[in-house]
């Protein structure tokens, strides 16, 4: 009995088109050969057939931009197939550096004075105060071990899950994502409890006790893991 040839391409039909699971252990050349045999040479479709979206799942294989373009062009030769997305479990070094830059916690020890702006891409851990007229901006969360009396903008790129935490919460203005709020005029006592600001289910910024944060954002554990 002839040995059955191992398949490197698994094709599954979905309501959105086709999903191709590509083997991530075979050689790149073998993968191209099988794609050509199964999708291009066997393609018998009418010239006016509608386009079908193809989603590629390549597992733990990394394709360079040139290889991605080669695979897209090869599949496009089947007349009615077009690659809509390529999903991989790995990322390039540049992508990894960019991801770390946007998700890392940046510790800063200083006082942000009036007219000064402190800007970070990831989460900000500020050990110090933000004076009136000072501004802190972060792509992620903002943690202030000190007094916030100026302006704080968390999740500046649109992350509405971001939060702002301060030992003393007396801000001139709070912003999370594209939502803005000013501190209530009636708040005069500073108290001894740290407070947090977040966007609630009504799409409004709410300031409350820090102890509620574990219930509001149960997945917020990166700060604890990295300190």
From Swiss-Prot:
Q: Does the keyword Glycosyltransferase apply?
A: no
Q: Name one GO biological process term.
A: cell morphogenesis
Q: Which Pfam families match?
A: MinC_C, MinC_N_1
Q: TM spans, by residue? A: none
Q: Which InterPro entries match?
A: CAP/MinC_C, MinC, MinC_C_sf, MinC_N_1, Septum_form_inhib_MinC_C
Would the keyword Cytoplasm be found if you checked this record's keyword annotation?
no
- Residue stretches in coiled coil: none
Going by the UniProt record, its keywords in alphabetical order are: Cell cycle, Cell division, Septation
State what this protein does: Cell division inhibitor that blocks the formation of polar Z ring septums. Rapidly oscillates between the poles of the cell to destabilize FtsZ filaments that have formed before they mature into polar Z rings. Prevents FtsZ polymerization.
* Protein family: Belongs to the MinC family.
Q: How does it assemble?
A: Interacts with MinD and FtsZ.
- Which HAMAP family is this protein grouped with? MinC (MF_00267)
Name the chain's protein: Probable septum site-determining protein MinC
Taxonomic source organism: Geobacillus kaustophilus (strain HTA426)
User: Upper lineage ranks?
Assistant: Bacteria, Bacillati, Bacillota, Bacilli, Bacillales
- Please state the gene responsible for encoding this protein: minC
């Amino acid at each position: 009995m002839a040995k059955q040839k191992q398949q490197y391409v698994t094709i599954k039909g979905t309501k959105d088109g086709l999903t191709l699971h590509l083997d991530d252990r075979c050689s790149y050349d073998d993968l191209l050969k099988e794609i050509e045999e199964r999708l291009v040479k066997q393609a018998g479709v009418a010239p006016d057939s509608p386009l079908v979206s193809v989603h590629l799942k390549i597992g733990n294989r990394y394709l360079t931009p040139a290889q991605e373009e080669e695979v897209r062009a090869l599949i496009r030769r089947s007349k009615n197939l077009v690659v809509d997305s390529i999903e991989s479990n790995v990322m390039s070094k540049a992508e990894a550096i960019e991801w770390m830059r946007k998700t890392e916690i940046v510790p800063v020890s200083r006082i942000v004075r009036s007219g000064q702006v402190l800007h970070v891409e990831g989460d900000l851990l500020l050990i110090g105060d933000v004076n009136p007229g000072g501004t802190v901006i972060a792509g992620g969360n903002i943690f202030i071990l000190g007094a916030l009396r100026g302006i704080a903008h968390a999740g500046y790129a649109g992350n509405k899950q971001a939060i702002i935490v301060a030992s003393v919460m007396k801000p001139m203005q709070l912003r999370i994502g594209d939502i803005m709020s000013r501190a209530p005029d009636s708040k005069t006592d500073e108290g001894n409890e740290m407070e947090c600001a977040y966007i609630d289910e009504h799409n409004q910024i709410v300031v409350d006790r820090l102890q509620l944060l574990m219930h509001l954002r149960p997945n917020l554990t990166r700060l604890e893991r990295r300190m």
